[in-house]
Amino acid sequence: MALETEAKNSNATATGDATATATKASGKAKENNNTAGGKKNLNPNSNQQNSNQNLVNGNGTAADGPAAKKKGKKNRNKSPTEPTTEAVLSNGHAEKPTVVDAVEDNADTNANVEKPQEGGAPDAEADGDDIDLDALQDIGITVNISSPGADLLCVQLSSMELVQEIHQLLMDREETCHRTCFSLQLDNVTLDNFAELKSINNLEQGSTIKVVEEPYTMREARIHVRHVRDLLKNLDPADAYNGIDCTSLTYLNTITQGDLLDKKRTRPDSVDCTPPEYVTPGVSDPPILPLHPNVKNAKGPQALKVLTTSAWNPPPGPRKLHGDLMYLYVVTMEDKRFHISACSKGFFINQSTDDTFNPKPDNPSHLSHSLIDLLSHISPSFRRAFQTIQKRRTMRHAFERVATPYQVYQWAAPILEHTVDAIRAEDAFSSKLGYEEHIPGQTRDWNEELQTTRELPRKTLPERLLRERAIFKVHGDFVTAATRGAMAVIDGNVLAINPGEDTKMQMFIWNNIFFSMGFDVRDHYKELGGDAAAFVAPRYDLHGVRVYNAVDIEGLYTLGTVVVDYRGYRVTAQSIIPGILEREQEQSVVYGSIDFGKTVLSHPKYLELLRQAGKHLKILPHVVLNERDEPVELCSSVECKGIIGNDGRHYILDLLRTFPPDVNFLKLQDVQLSKELVDMGFPIEHRHKLCCLRQELLEAFIEDRHVNFIRIAAARLQQLTTIKQSEKSEANPVPALEGAEAASKVNGAEKPDDKEKKNEEEEKKERSTSGEARAAAIVNAIREAQSNVATSNEVQAAEVVKRACAAVGSLKEKEFDFRFNPDVFSPGIRHADGEEGTSLAKQKVLVQEAAEFLVLKQIPAFIKEHMSHSSSPIDGQSLTESLHSHGINVRYLGKVIKILSQMPRMDYLHRIAVLELIVRATKHIYYTYMQNTEPLHLSAAISHFLNCLLTNGPVNPAVSSEEAHKKRGNGGKHNKHKSSKGGKGQQQQQTTGNQNGSSSGSSNSSSASDWTLMTPRSLWQQIRKEAKVYWDWELDCDSIETAVSKYGILRISLMRAFCLKVGIQVLLREYNFESKHKPTFGDDDIVNVFPIVKHISPRATDAYNFYTTGQAKIQQGLFKEGYELISGALNLLNNVFGALHQENGSCLRMLARLSYLLGDAQDALAIQQRAVIMSERVNGMDHPSTILEYTHLSLYSFANGHVGMSLKLLYRARYLMVLICGEDHPEVALIDSNISLILHALGEYELSLRFIEHALKLNLKYFGDKDMHVALSYHLMARTQSCMGDFRSALNNEKETYSFYKSQLGENHEKTRDSAECLRLLTQQAVLLQRKMNDIYSSGKLTSDLPPIHITPPSMGSVLDMLNTINGILFVKISRKDIVKVRSEIEKHFKTDSTENEVNDAINSIVAAANNNGEAEDAVSKDIKEQPEAGKQLTNGDKAAATEATSS
C-alpha cells in the first residue's frame, strides 16, 4: 500500500519530498506528500497536525502582519504576535506559532462527538464551557538561520513544528526561494525533516541553524527546474484561468491598489468618488470586462523566452559517469541560446548546440548550485525581471499564494498567450498525477489510503484533528485525481479494461480509480426509467455515501466516490475494493441484492453495522422475501450491497436508495394522495423512479411530529390531573386532548383555511409572542408532563402515551418511533410481516405523510422565511442551497414558482427561480446535444448552442475550413459513447458490483452533424417542453426576447448561470446579443470546457462544536467569550483544512463582525480583508458570498477612514450583484443606501440622490410602505434633498418618515422626536426660502438681504452611525444611571434566596459589556438585523447566529 510503503521510505526521501511538494507556492500537492509524509501522519503521537499551522491566528491576525499593529487591546490575543519576517510558511501556508496542544483534559470534552446533530448546540455549549483556549496555544522558540549568500535570518517558531516547515519557510522567502536541494544542520548534525523542534537536542533560544547545499540527484534536479519554472510563472494567471494546480483568482488587491491596512486615512475632499457608468442605477445590461479588472497587466515581466528540457536528454552512459543528470535549453530575453548541464554539484553552461552535442563546460566555466544564480549571471534581463517578480510576489497577500482545497473554474477568460513549456507538456502527457513520480511506490492505492485514514484513532482532540486532517488531505487528492481521470476517459486517453466489448459497455481503470460511463446497456434500469435513471443514480449514490460517512460507524466502509460531468457525459469515479476485480459479482456480494430483489442476501455483521447507522439515519429494519419465499432481514434498501474485501473490511455500495421514495413523483396504484396534493397536480410521473426524499426533510418531519407528540401527551396529562382535582374541588377542565389531536393531523400545521379564519387580535397576539416564550411554554409543559407521569397512575400514563403515538402516527403503539422503510414502494420487492405495530400499511402511510409534509409545510415555510428578505438568495446556487436546507428537492421548483408568481413582494425570488429552471432545463438538452457532436466540432457546436439560447439573430453554423480539412471518419473517443437516449449505463455493478451508472437527457441519437439543425425557436420549444415534463410548470415564452420581457431575466445572467452549470468558458469580451447581421458567438469565443465535480466534503467536528458554542455565547451577548470560541474554531479549521476553506471564511466573517462590535475597527478590517480574498479564491469572484464579504469590508473601510476605498468596494459589490441577478433585488437596495450615504458625506448630492431614489423604490416594492427600511430611505432622501436646497421635497419625504415612526414607535420614541425636530428645521428653512422667493417675485429684483443657504456637511461620525444602522448594527449608549437601574431590576427578579454574589455577577457582566471600549459613556452593541448569508455557512449550511446582545 502507498501509505505503508511511504512510511518505510519517509526518512530517505524527507528532503526531497519537502522540496518536491514546494515547487509551487500554490501547488495542490504541498501538504506533506499525499498523506503527509506517511510515517508521521499515521502516527497518532506525532502531533503532525501542527505541520499545517494557522495562516490566521485565533484572533484573526495573519502572518503577513496586520495584527502586529495591535497592542494587546482588549487582551483578546492569547499568544505573542511576531513580526512579519518571523512568519513561517508551512506547505504553502503562512505559519503562526499557535498550535493545538495535546491536552487530554480539554480534548476529552469533545471526545464523544462523532456527528453533531441539529440539536447539538446546547451540548456544544456545555463542552465549550470546559475548554481552556490557552491550552490550545504553544510557546515560541527563536532561532537564527544562516544561508549561503544571505543575511542571518531570525525566526520565531513553535516548538511543536517540524523541521520540514523551515524548508518551506526558506523556499518562500525572497532571498532563499531559489534553493531546493539543501539540508539543515545544527552543530554540524543534519536534522531530520520530520522531527519536531522540541525533540532536537541542543536546540535553544537563539541557536543558529545552518543551511547546507546538498548534491543533486536526477530527481532533485527535476524538482529544482520545476520550482524555478513556478517562480518565474508565479504572477501569471494562466493556470488560474485554465483550472490547473488548484490556483484561482482574486482581484481585491487590484481594486484597493494594495493592502488596505497600509493605506492612510483619506480626506473627503481628496476622494475620487465618481462611479463607473455600469454601476449607476438604471443599467440594463452590465458589461463583462469589469469582471476581470486590470487583466492586461496581471502578468508579470517576462524573464526568459524559453526554458525547456533539451533534446539531448538523457545523458549517454559516459556522461552519466561524469555526473551529468539532465540537459536544459534556454533562450534569454537578449535572444542568446544556451545549453545547460545539470550535474550533482549544480548547473553550468555546456558547449552543445542545436546540431552538435558537446557536453563539456563552456569557457569560461561558471558552476552554480542554483539555476537562478546561473541564469542571473548570463542574462542581465533575467536578473532584473526576476527581482521584479520576486518583489511583486512577496507583496501579494499570503492567501493569494496558497492553493485552494478544490479547483475553482472561471466561466470567462481572456486570450492567453501559449508559450513553450516543457514541464507543462510533461504533465499533460504523463499518466500520473503531478508529483506522483516522486512518491515511494509510484501509484497510490486510493482505497487503502481512504480507509486507513478513517481507521485512525479518534478518542482525544489531537487524535481527532490528525484523523480529520488526514481524511481531508487524502480526499482532496482523490478528487483531483478522479477529475483528471474522468476527463481523460471522455477525451479517449485511457484504455478500457474490456476493449473487446461494445464501447458502451467498456470500463476503465486509471491511477487505481475505477471509472464508469453510465449507459444503461444491459437494461439494468429498464424498470426504473432507463437512461434517465442511470444518469441520476450516481448522484443519489453520492448522497448515500455522504450520510454514511457523516454517521461514521466504526467498521463500516464506503468507497471514495466522485461524480464528474464533462462534455455532456457523467462519469462516476470510485476507489476499488481489494479483490473485487478478481471475483464474479455473485461471489462478492454477501448482503443485499444484485437483481433488485429477486435474490436477497443478509449477513449478521452487516446487520449489526447497518442497524447502528440506521438509528441515526432513521432507517427501519425490515424483512423481505427472496425468490424462495424465505424471509431475509435488511437494515437498508435492497439495492445496497455489502462486499467483504480481500482486506477484511466490510464495504457498502450502491446507496442510491438510502432514503424513502417520494410518492408525489411516483404513480402507484395502491397510493391515494390527499385532496390538497391532488388539487396541486400530484402525483407527477417523473422520468425515472429513483426520486427520494432528502435527509433534511425527514429530520424536520420527525421533529415536527415529536413536538406534536409532546404537546398531545402534556395536554392529556393536564386533563387527567384536572379531572382528579375536580373530583375534590369544582374546577374548570383544561382544553381537551381532542383539540390537540386534531391540530396534529395536518403534520402539526394549521390548514390554510384555519389560518384565514383567525381574527386580527389573535394574529397580533401570535406575532407578539417571541420564539423564546413559546419555547419556554413547551419546556414547562414537558416538565409538568414528566412530573405528572411520575405521580399519575402508570396505566393512565401508558394510555396517554399510546393515544399520543396514535395521534401523530408513530410506528409503534406505545413508543414514539419514526423510521422509514426505503423499500416500501420498490417494485418487485415482497415484504414479510413486520414487527408488532410496524405493519407495511403503517410504513407506507408514514412515507406518504412525509411527502405531504414537504408540500404543505416545508414549501410554505421556505417562502415565509424569505418574506423578510433577511437572507435573500442571489442566484440559482444560493436558491438551491436554501431549498435543500428545508428538505425541498429541486424537482419541486415548478410548484415553488407557481406560488411565488402570486406574490409581488417575492418578485426577485420568482425571477431567480425561473432563471434557475430555464438553466436546468437547458442543461438537460445540452448534455444530449453534446453527446451527438464530434470532437473537432465542439467549439462550433457550443457557440451555435449559445447563439440559439441567447440571441434571435442569424445562427448559421458553418464548419470552418480548418475543421473540414481535419475531419475524417468518426474522429475520436467522444462518438464511441453515443447513447440512443443520450445516457450512460452502469458497468462496474454489472460485472463487479462496484459502481452505479449515469445517464443524460432523453432525445434520440442522430448523425454527428444534427447539431447544425438547431434554431433558437426549436431550442426554446424544447426548453418549454422540458419545463413542463420535468417540473410541471408552463414556461410562457418561446424566445429569449419574451423571457427577458416577461420575467425580467438578463441575458448576461443567463449566460453566466448556464456556463457555470455545464462547464463552458467563454472569451472575456463584450457580446452584442442584439446583433442582426452576424452570430453573437463564434468558434473563437469558446475558450475551454471544464468539468463539474460533485463530491462529499469532510467535516471538522471539533471546530463545529467550538463554532456553535461561540454562536450561543454571542446570542447571550457575551461577545468576548464568543470571539475566543470562534477563534478556537478557526484554529482547529486551519489544522484540519489548511489556510483556505469555505468554513474558514465563515469564521473570519464572524470574527470581523465581532471585532467591529467590540469597537476595534482596525482589527475588523484586517480580518475581513482576508475573508474577501478567501471567498474570491475558494468560492469564486462572483459568488454570492463574495458580494457579502465586499459589503462588510466597505463598512469597516469607512470606519477606518478609507472613504474612497469603501466606495470602490461597494461599486464592486453592486456590479457583481447586477451581473448575477439584475438591479431588482432587496440586497441592491442595501448597497445603494450605503453608496448614497457615503456620496452624501462627500458632497456628491446629485449622485447620492440617484442611488437613494433607487433604494427607496426597491424598499417600497419588497418591504411595503410600513417598514423601517422605507422610513430610513425617506429620511436619507430628505437629508440629501435638503443639502441640495430642495426643501419642499425634503419636507415631504421626512413627513413620511415621521408618520411611520409615530404610528409604529409612538410619539415619545427617540426616533420620532428626532424626525419631528428634523421636520421643524426643514419647515423653517422652507418657509424662509419661500418668503424670500415671494419677495423677489413681488419686487422683481433680488433683495440684498437674502441670506445664503448654509449647508453643513454631515460629520464622518454621524455618517458612520447611519451606515451602522443601515447595515443592521445599533450601538446603544448606557450611562452609569442605567446600570444602577438595571441592578435594582435584577435584584427584584432574582429569587429571595439568591446570594449577593449572583446579583453582582449579573451586574458585572453588564458593566463589562459597557466597558468594552473603556469609555465613560460606554456602548453595548446590538445587531438588529441578521446580514444575508448568501454563501454556504460553517458545516453544511448551518446559519451563523445574529450577533445580538441585550442591554439588560
From Swiss-Prot:
Give a yes or no for keyword Phosphoprotein in this entry: yes
Q: Which residues carry this modification: Phosphoserine?
A: S270
- Pfam families attached here? CLU (PF13236), CLU_N (PF15044), eIF3_p135 (PF12807), GSKIP_dom (PF05303), TPR_10 (PF13374), TPR_12 (PF13424)
Question: Where is this chain's protein located in or outside the cell?
Answer: Cytoplasm
- Segments forming domain Clu: 424-666
The segment annotated Disordered runs over: 1-96, 110-129, 265-286, 726-773, 958-1010, 1414-1448
> What outcome is recorded for mutants in which this gene has been deleted?
Causes mitochondria to cluster within cells.
**Keywords linked to the UniProt accession:** Cytoplasm, Phosphoprotein
| Record field: compositional bias (Basic and acidic residues) | 748-769, 1419-1429
The molecular function terms of the Gene Ontology recorded here are:
mRNA binding; ribosome binding
Membrane-spanning ranges: none
Q: Where is this chain compositionally biased, Polar residues type?
A: 78-88
Q: Which family does it belong to?
A: Belongs to the CLU family.
Matching entries from PANTHER family are given as: CLUSTERED MITOCHONDRIA PROTEIN HOMOLOG, EUKARYOTIC TRANSLATION INITIATION FACTOR 3 SUBUNIT EIF-3
This chain belongs to which protein, by name? Protein clueless
